[in-house]
Amino acid sequence: LGLRIDWWAPFRKNKGAVKLHTQFDIKTEIHSFVHLSDGLHHDINFLDQVSLEKKAFYIMDKAYISFKRFSRIHDAGAFFVTRLQTNQDYRRIYSNPVDKTTGIMCDQVIRMNNFYPSKFYPDYLRRIKYRDVVGEKRLEFLTNNFELSALEIAALYKYRWRIELFFKWIKQHLKIKS
């Protein structure tokens, strides 16, 4: 966007950038919280604005990974599901049995090894490796939920794509370049 339009969101010398962060309620299929920010601030700062609900699931992409914020979600009695970054170092504590015909390749209890992740989130986490049988895409999930099945966690993450479709719709109708 040009600076004449979004002067409040500078990004480069002659260009502005706006980030739209949303919280999407899966049950009602309504965006329950929307936050605009300039393009200079990191995406994870959005999590500080969210009022957390007990037993709610917060499903997010890798840009929102912050173990300090995950701890806040966990302490609120809520759950998160995200994709595991490839550079994350963890230690496997236990492997749950899986049926690989469902697409679940592994379901593990892990603990983070790196200093800051283990400092901010010392509790156990769950790592789920999933292969989408339709698209052959391989995904690794990280969650603090140990109650749902691994397949249910993978299905929850698929709901995140509804937000991506919303952003695609906005870009098409407002003629915004990314």
Residue ranges and their predicted role:
Residues 3, 7, 11-178:
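Single, function-defining residue in the core of a domain
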